[in-house]
């Protein structure tokens, strides 16, 4: 198998499709990323796309 070079970007936060932004909330600050600009780096390239949603599981006995 030939070697390969991987160009990968990971962004985690709340996605707003109307404005194509992802907002990441950390303990220190809030960061907003231009998702359309990020995707433009891959324009015309052969890509693999994965979208994942994460939710915390409810804890038994806690409301």
Swiss-Prot record:
InterPro entries: Phage_SP-beta_YonK, YonK_sf. SUPFAM superfamilies: YonK-like. Disulfide bonds: none annotated. Octamer. This is SPbeta prophage-derived uncharacterized protein YonK.
């Amino acid at each position: 198998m030939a070697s390969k070079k991987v160009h990968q970007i990971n962004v985690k936060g709340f996605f707003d499709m109307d404005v194509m932004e992802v907002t990441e909330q950390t303990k220190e600050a809030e960061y907003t990323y231009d998702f359309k600009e990020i995707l433009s780096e891959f324009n015309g390239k052969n890509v693999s796309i994965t979208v994942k949603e994460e939710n915390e599981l409810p804890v038994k006995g806690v409301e």
